[in-house]
Amino acid sequence: MRQTKTGILLANLGTPDAPTPEAVKRYLKQFLSDRRVVDTSRLLWWPLLRGVILPLRSPRVAKLYASVWMEGGSPLMVYSRQQQQALAQRLPETPVALGMSYGSPSLESAVDELLAEHVDHIVVLPLYPQYSCSTVGAVWDELARILARKRSIPGISFIRDYADNHDYINALANSVRASFAKHGEPDLLLLSYHGIPQRYADEGDDYPQRCRTTTRELASALEMAPEKVMMTFQSRFGREPWLMPYTDETLKMLGEKGVGHIQVMCPGFAADCLETLEEIAEQNREVFLGAGGKKYEYIPALNATSEHIEMMANLVAAYR
């Protein structure tokens, strides 16, 4: 019996190729054109996107990217490449490819890379610990489109999420403990997840439940009282209601109420990126301190730490 050759596809959101208005515009156009991300009527959305949002947002967002850009590219790309390389070293007999839903390298290039290695089974690991239709669902859709163009398709194992995975929770808990040891235990640990429109949850997306699961499991692993751990949602976009409470408004309220020391972690981000390094580590720090808070630390994403890579290796092993 022929032995199956398995490859691993690490999937994430994507990033502009450069911190320039032109590169950001190309990226945002692809990202915001996905119906999984914005499902507004195309007759209404196209003129707004092309005539208002892209011209106005691209220069401003490019400046934000420039403030966190690294020597090897955007933080998300640098850390994602490190994850890919570290996992390949951990699993030397298994090809590991990296693909992004938007921008480069594409999911299609990642699939082609694995097929060129003659794999007949691909384990797809979207690096979103908590499922959402707008992230994991988008990976599924694009993968289906890619494979629909192939005469021969490999077997596929698709990891929906890992919100309560034991190794993931332990890695988060150890990261929090290290931050507490370095900076002192805060008055409050705030867990900030990327938001989605409330309507998506109302229509069946179980993302908020998956975030609550991670929050509950992490608090339990840390043996922290429930009142010392708070869950919020960041990065809202547009005018319709998103999941609440909002991170920025919560930090302002906590500062005004006299909470002195806060540490913030973003458990939904497998790699640091614009939303963590600029929005959370910088913008929201200013919000909290400006409202009267005294001390604020951002706890970095797991990135390519050894515990994170070991978690990935153990996770994909169950699907090989």
UniProtKB/Swiss-Prot annotation:
Any GO CC annotation of this UniProt entry: cytoplasm
Keywords, alphabetical: Cytoplasm, Heme biosynthesis, Iron, Lyase, Metal-binding, Porphyrin biosynthesis
Stored InterPro entries: Ferrochelatase (IPR001015), Ferrochelatase_AS (IPR019772), Ferrochelatase_C (IPR033644), Ferrochelatase_N (IPR033659)
Record carries keyword Metal-binding: yes
GO MF annotation terms: ferrochelatase activity; metal ion binding
Compartments, as annotated in UniProt: Cytoplasm
Top-level taxon of origin: Bacteria
Listed pathway(s): Porphyrin-containing compound metabolism; protoheme biosynthesis; protoheme from protoporphyrin-IX: step 1/1
Catalytic reaction(s) noted: heme b + 2 H(+) = protoporphyrin IX + Fe(2+)
Enzyme Commission number, as recorded: 4.98.1.1
Any single Pfam family the record assigns to this protein: Ferrochelatase
GO biological process terms held by the UniProt record: heme biosynthetic process
Disulfide bonds: none
Binding site for Fe cation: H194, E275
Subunit structure: Monomer.
Entry function: Catalyzes the ferrous insertion into protoporphyrin IX.
Membership in a protein family: Belongs to the ferrochelatase family.
Protein name: Ferrochelatase
Name of the gene encoding the protein in the UniProt record: hemH
